[in-house]
């Protein structure tokens, strides 16, 4: 049992380090020699990179950050599909249950890693893009539905943070409608609450009517990824 727990623990540690890869920070240093955390919203996410460095770096950050979340969940599923890995499980282990639990834990670790990166003194982004990557591998139908809600709200409001919050709030309902396992529903609640909490400053600006829209040039802007 100890070896089995250790193997799963390693998967979760790797998931955290995947999530903590500081894409936006590294692009800021490489392209302009700046610390992206000292500009705009002071976030390493794709929205702040877009506003600070431009479309190309912003899209690159978005793509890599999505892959971080997707990679964390894909790694767990790959491990659980490997007979050598499964030989470490005790004979009475419910593999299906363990898989669901470790998948959601790996997803949460990747999300945490993005927003609290060990490489950046536990700072980072808002975890929206990384969370989307997790969803697309965990349940691609829910991931696409959440992306659709994000796209709809951003097209109507031009406010990225409001779109991210709307998508996060919709997750438990989408998981329930898609009849996903209870573990995935619990993940959607936990991840959704965390993403909304990460947007607390944005919520205050939304209530005050000062949250910038896409295309606006603000000295202090918001980041939703």
UniProtKB/Swiss-Prot annotation:
The chain crosses the membrane at residues 1-21, 56-76, 95-115, 134-154, 159-178, 182-201. Its main location: membrane. GO terms for molecular function: acyl-phosphate glycerol-3-phosphate acyltransferase activity. This is Glycerol-3-phosphate acyltransferase. It comes from Acaryochloris marina (strain MBIC 11017). InterPro entries: G3P_acylTferase_PlsY (IPR003811). It is a multi-pass membrane protein. Belongs to the PlsY family. Its EC number is 2.3.1.275. It is found in: Cell inner membrane. It holds the Pfam family G3P_acyltransf. One of its GO terms (cellular component) is plasma membrane. One of its GO terms (biological process) is phospholipid biosynthetic process. Pathway: Lipid metabolism; phospholipid metabolism. Catalyzes the transfer of an acyl group from acyl-phosphate (acyl-PO(4)) to glycerol-3-phosphate (G3P) to form lysophosphatidic acid (LPA). This enzyme utilizes acyl-phosphate as fatty acyl donor, but not acyl-CoA or acyl-ACP. The gene is plsY. It comes from the Bacteria. It catalyses: an acyl phosphate + sn-glycerol 3-phosphate = a 1-acyl-sn-glycero-3-phosphate + phosphate. Keywords: Cell inner membrane, Cell membrane, Lipid biosynthesis, Lipid metabolism, Membrane, Phospholipid biosynthesis, Phospholipid metabolism, Transferase, Transmembrane, Transmembrane helix. Probably interacts with PlsX.
């Amino acid at each position: 049992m100890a070896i089995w727990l250790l193997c799963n623990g390693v998967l979760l540690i790797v998931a955290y380090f995947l999530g903590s890869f500081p894409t936006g920070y590294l692009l800021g240093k490489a392209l302009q020699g700046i610390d992206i955390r000292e500009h705009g919203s002071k976030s390493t996410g794709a929205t702040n990179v877009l506003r600070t460095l431009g479309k190309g770096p912003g899209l690159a950050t978005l793509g890599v950050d999505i892959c971080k979340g997707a990679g964390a969940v894909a790694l767990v599923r790959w491990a659980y599909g490997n007979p050598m890995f499964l030989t470490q499980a005790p004979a009475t282990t419910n593999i299906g249950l363990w898989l669901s639990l470790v998948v959601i834990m790996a997803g949460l670790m990747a999300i945490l890693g993005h927003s609290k990166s060990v490489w950046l003194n536990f700072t980072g982004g808002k975890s929206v893009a990384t969370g989307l990557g997790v969803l697309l591998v965990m349940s691609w139908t829910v991931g696409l539905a959440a992306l659709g809600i994000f796209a709809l709200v951003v097209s109507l409001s031009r406010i990225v943070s409001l779109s991210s919050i709307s998508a996060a709030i919709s997750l438990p309902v989408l998981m329930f409608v898609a009849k996903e396992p209870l573990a995935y529903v619990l993940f959607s609640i936990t991840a959704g609450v965390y993403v909304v909490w990460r947007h607390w400053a944005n919520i205050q600006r939304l209530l005050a009517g000062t949250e910038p829209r896409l295309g606006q040039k603000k000295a202090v802007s918001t980041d939703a990824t």
